Curated annotation (Swiss-Prot):
<feature type="region of interest" description="Uridylyl-removing">
    <location>
        <begin position="370"/>
        <end position="722"/>
    </location>
</feature>
<dbReference type="Pfam" id="PF08335">
    <property type="entry name" value="GlnD_UR_UTase"/>
</dbReference>
<dbReference type="InterPro" id="IPR002934">
    <property type="entry name" value="Polymerase_NTP_transf_dom"/>
</dbReference>
<dbReference type="Pfam" id="PF01966">
    <property type="entry name" value="HD"/>
</dbReference>
<feature type="domain" description="HD">
    <location>
        <begin position="486"/>
        <end position="608"/>
    </location>
</feature>
<dbReference type="InterPro" id="IPR003607">
    <property type="entry name" value="HD/PDEase_dom"/>
</dbReference>
<keyword id="KW-0548">Nucleotidyltransferase</keyword>
<dbReference type="GO" id="GO:0008773">
    <property type="term" value="F:[protein-PII] uridylyltransferase activity"/>
</dbReference>
<protein>
    <recommendedName>
        <fullName>Bifunctional uridylyltransferase/uridylyl-removing enzyme</fullName>
        <ecNumber>2.7.7.59</ecNumber>
        <ecNumber>3.1.4.-</ecNumber>
    </recommendedName>
</protein>
<dbReference type="InterPro" id="IPR045865">
    <property type="entry name" value="ACT-like_dom_sf"/>
</dbReference>
<comment type="similarity">
    <text>Belongs to the GlnD family.</text>
</comment>
<keyword id="KW-0808">Transferase</keyword>
<keyword id="KW-0460">Magnesium</keyword>
<dbReference type="InterPro" id="IPR013546">
    <property type="entry name" value="PII_UdlTrfase/GS_AdlTrfase"/>
</dbReference>
<dbReference type="GO" id="GO:0006808">
    <property type="term" value="P:regulation of nitrogen utilization"/>
</dbReference>
<feature type="domain" description="ACT 1">
    <location>
        <begin position="723"/>
        <end position="802"/>
    </location>
</feature>
<dbReference type="InterPro" id="IPR002912">
    <property type="entry name" value="ACT_dom"/>
</dbReference>
Length: 912
């Protein structure tokens, strides 16, 4: 039965609607159908409008909106049924078999619907449906379909209902929430009685096991974290479906009719039930807003919708945190609460089954083993008494330290008590030496720190013990780059670090796996990983603010002054290595020298490499790739050589000789090319390019002698990209035209080096991937690349309009406000001016920027492209036409203006 709906007739007046339908039929008879549909549609539209008005007036009243939607559909179904049975297929003398019960099932049965939810209906008949029953059911369905409702329906006899419910979990779950809507009430009661007696009775344990398995598979399918930044409100981890699962299990086992009765049967406390209702109401509000905004059954809270839902639900900006970030933080806190409720619910369930002589989870209950103030029983860590933590709040930290050292799960009842008593952690506990030592044991555990820290976070102990961490719990970053909340990202980074240390990541991270064994201070590395994003969401640079947090927190954790200083340095500079590797020219010695000048020691270099890798990896799937691994490895090796040899490192001439020798080893019997075509290439080329690319370039130059244009493309596994080499007569605008051709072929340039041989031939090397970071390695893709470049250079295509028409690989980037920025740096290189342009990522951005540089009469010598979700950062090493740096203020202002115009989101007329 639905809860009482306030002012029902403002939503729909069933009697008035039924009278209007009857009047239409009386007037038009069999020709009345269009008029009846129009009346019904009008009632549906006005009902939806009234519910939308109520949601706008009370934007957090989610369950009220959901019940209102179900009420509206109920009334329409009743009017349609009475019209069909009483007028369209009126039967004066029906047999006992000509009876129909209309049962709402699934979410509709529960009385909870979003504006565009499916309408799930079961038509039940006493025996196999007669022709009259079939006609009535079909007519009812056609009316519902004509209203534009998406109807899920079944038509079965009583026996079929029972038989199918026994064999199909989905049908059983749907019928579990079966609710009488209209029709034959006695038939509904008979179906309900048989369902409980013949289907449910004796299958409770099987149902629970199947529902939990179904839940786990759903989580895995949707991203097994409740902190995915574009969550599915209905199906995602910690969402509505998880709450429904608890209700289904409670109903199946204890026959509860409402979630409030979960308290009466001992599965939730009154306080936990209030948390259940709070989360449910909030998620229903979000879901109803999503349907209202999109006008469809949209349950995914995507970036473009998050801002609007936050606004509708009256979230406002606060210093350092936008309205959408505050809204999403509240969302994730509710999802976290659902996870906690699930744990305690299942713990109580386990206990109830255990009291029936056998544990539900079938764990053999061995003799208790005492561990400090706790015990281990059945492979789980438990607490002996309700007041265990109240006696000594330090035990709240000790619980997790014991779980880490003993490699055991924490019993859900112990988690429940820890969650309840987390508030006992005060300033005295935080200062306690033993508590801090225990926390450090968890953080630096050689077993599984990620899992235990996640438990600690779920219980609320982590954020209470480290309040700065508590500030980033459930905090999202409103961008497309970070896939997880800050706390989840941090915990994952710690887990990745532990995995590298155990040698489990050698294939993916050979350098890191080798370096980790040379690190002098594990504690520094783990604490720095914990703190690297600790100041996210505050006003100011989170790296600088995080270093300040480290200086205060590390001594409390028991770190020495030297360790504290090193942690603070790592937090302050945790973005330095990736910024240098991905946005600077590693072949320019000044890049390495500047980097080393900041790093200053091999220990810092090792620690920074490891922190950088786990930070990038923990951002989310698809962010790490072999190209990034190669760049970080190149930077590490170059920096380590400078730190190790200092001024004794090889000079420019010696490095070129060594490079030529290495190239000769690759070319083997063709090593004569070094002295023939290789003569055309200057020293800068030999220093900049790696040996394997030089070998390929020399062979291509030899084969292309006398040709006006040569384009080659090879799959380049070492870089995780396709190497595209273009040989052509050098002329102004060559670079932007090549870039345009590559973009037209579906390529995304991630790195480019531009050289001019002594004979005037341009030797340009590009590393190319598809827009999703994958290589273009199929024969058809490579052929398309070659043809597109040739067409662009021959002016056979109008680049700009064609590029502008290409769809964006990441269309959701439009949800973000990315203001273009241009930065000039004349200190980053001895020979070149370095220009860094940040802008919204979109098709052919590089082409636009390169064209702007060409129009500003600048020569591009190398380009380095990095993307961070919706934001692209393109870095160019340039000179003027005379080979000089751009250093006049007026010139820089003029170039900046051109680049900002090119970076703007607007259509550009083709002048190519």
């Amino acid at each position: 039965m639905l809860p009482r709906i306030a002012n029902q007739r403002a939503i729909v007046d069933r009697r008035a609607l039924a009278d209007a339908v009857s009047a239409a039929f009386a007037e038009q008879g069999d020709r009345s159908r269009p008029a009846v549909v129009e009346l019904l549609r009008g009632a549906l539209d006005s009902g939806r409008a009234e519910l939308a008005r109520r949601l706008e007036a009370r934007p957090s009243a989610g369950t009220e909106c959901a019940h209102g939607q179900a009420f509206l559909v109920d009334q329409l179904v009743r009017v349609i049924h009475d019209h069909v049975v009483g007028k369209v297929y009126r039967a004066s003398n029906r047999s006992t078999g000509e009876r129909i019960a209309i049962i709402a099932v699934g979410g509709y049965g529960r009385g909870e619907m979003a504006p565009h939810s499916d309408v799930d209906i079961a038509f039940v008949t006493p025996i196999k449906p007669t022709s009259w029953c079939e006609q009535v059911i079909e007519a009812i369905l056609y009316f519902l379909w004509d209203l534009g409702l998406k109807v899920g329906h079944s038509s079965r006899s009583l026996d079929e209902v029972v038989r199918m419910a026994k064999s199909d979990l989905t049908i059983r779950t749907a019928l579990l929430e079966g609710r009488y809507v209209w029709g034959d009430r006695d038939l509904f009661d008979a179906a309900s009685a048989r369902f409980w007696n013949e289907v449910v009775n004796g299958t409770e344990k099987q149902f629970v096991a199947e529902k939990l398995q179904e839940r786990n598979e759903r989580h895995k399918r949707l991203g097994d974290s409740r902190y995915v930044v574009e969550p599915n409100v209905k199906e995602g981890k910690g969402g509505l479906r998880d709450l429904h699962t608890l209700y289904w299990i409670g109903k199946y086992i204890h026959k509860v009719r409402d979630a409030s009765e979960l308290v009466d049967v001992g599965l939730l406390t009154a306080e936990e039930y209030r948390a259940f209702r709070r989360a449910e109401n909030f998620f229903w509000a979000v879901r109803c807003h999503l349907h209202a905004i999109t006008r469809r059954a949209e349950d995914r809270l995507t970036f473009d919708l998050q801002r609007e839902v936050a606004m509708r639900m009256n979230f406002a900006d606060r210093p350092g945190k936008s309205a959408v970030e505050r809204f999403m933080q509240y969302f994730f806190l509710q999802a976290k609460q659902v996870g906690s409720l699930t744990g305690v619910f299942l713990a109580q369930l386990d206990g109830q089954f255990a009291r029936q002589k056998r544990s539900f989870f079938a764990s053999l209950r061995s003799r208790r083993k005492k561990v400090g103030p706790f015990f281990i029983e059945g492979g789980k860590l438990g607490v002996p008494a309700e007041d265990t933590f109240q006696q000594d709040p330090v035990r709240l930290v000790e619980l997790f330290a014991v779980a880490a050292s003993e490699k055991v799960e924490i019993h859900p009842e112990a988690m429940r008590l820890a969650r309840r008593d987390a508030g006992l952690i005060d300033a005295a506990v935080r200062k306690d030496q033993r508590a801090n030592a225990l926390f450090l044991d968890v953080l630096t555990s050689r077993n599984d720190p990620e899992t235990v820290l996640r438990w600690m976070n779920e219980a609320g102990v982590f954020g209470r013990f480290v309040p700065d961490f508590g500030r980033v719990v459930a905090q999202m970053q409103f961008d497309m780059y970070h896939h997880y909340t800050v706390d989840e990202h941090t915990i994952r980074a710690i887990g990745l670090l532990a995995s590298i240390e155990k040698g489990e990541a050698k294939a993916d991270h050979p350098l890191a796996s080798e370096v980790v064994g040379k690190v002098a201070s594990r504690r520094v590395l783990y604490v720095a990983t914990l703190l690297h994003d600790i100041a996210k969401g505050r006003r100011g640079d989170h790296s600088v603010l995080g270093a300040e947090v480290a200086m205060k927190l590390c001594p409390r954790l028991g770190l020495s002054a030297a360790e504290t200083e090193l942690v603070a340095w790592l937090v302050r500079w945790h973005l330095l290595m990736s910024a240098t590797a991905f946005k600077r020219d590693l072949a320019d010695y000044k890049t390495i020298a500047d980097f080393v000048n900041t790093v200053q020691s091999q220990e810092r270099l090792r620690l920074l490499l490891l922190l950088t890798i786990v930070d990038i990896r923990a951002v989310g799937p698809g962010v790490w790739n072999s190209w990034k691994r190669q760049l970080l490895g190149d930077l590490f090796v170059s920096a380590e050589e400078v730190l190790r040899l200092g001024h004794k490192q090889h000079g420019r001439a010696e490095r070129i000789i060594a490079k030529k020798k290495a190239v000769g080893a690759i070319l083997k019997e063709r090593d004569n090319l070094i002295g023939t075509v290789g003569r055309q290439l200057g020293d800068a080329y030999w220093i900049a390019e790696p040996e394997d690319i030089i070998a390929l370039n020399l062979q291509q130059m030899d084969q292309a002698l006398g040709e006006l244009l040569s384009v080659e493309a090879h799959w380049y596994p070492a870089r995780g990209a396709t190497l595209v080499t273009v040989l052509a007569a050098d002329h102004p605008g060559l670079f932007y035209r090549i870039a345009g051709g590559i973009h037209l072929a579906g390529g995304n340039i991630i790195d480019a080096r531009i050289h001019t041989a002594r004979n005037g031939t341009a030797v340009d090397n590009f590393l190319v991937q598809d827009p999703l970071g994958r290589p273009l390695n199929e024969a058809s893709q490579i052929e398309r690349l070659k043809n597109a470049i040739a067409d662009a250079l021959a002016n056979r295509v109008k680049l700009v309009p064609q590029l502008a028409a290409r769809p964006l690989a990441r269309p959701r980037a439009d949800a973000f406000d990315v203001r273009p920025i241009v930065i000039f740096d004349n200190k980053a290189s001895n020979r070149f001016t370095v220009i860094e342009v940040g802008a919204r990522d979109r098709p052919a951005l590089l082409n636009r920027l390169a064209r702007a540089l060409f129009e500003a009469r600048l020569i591009v010598h190398s380009a380095h492209i990095a993307t961070y979700g919706e934001r692209a950062v393109d870095t160019f090493y340039v000179t003027d036409v005379l080979g000089e740096k751009v250093d006049s203020e007026a010139r820089m202002k003029a170039v900046e203006k051109r680049l900002l115009e090119a970076a703007e989101d607007r259509k550009v007329k083709d002048a190519a």
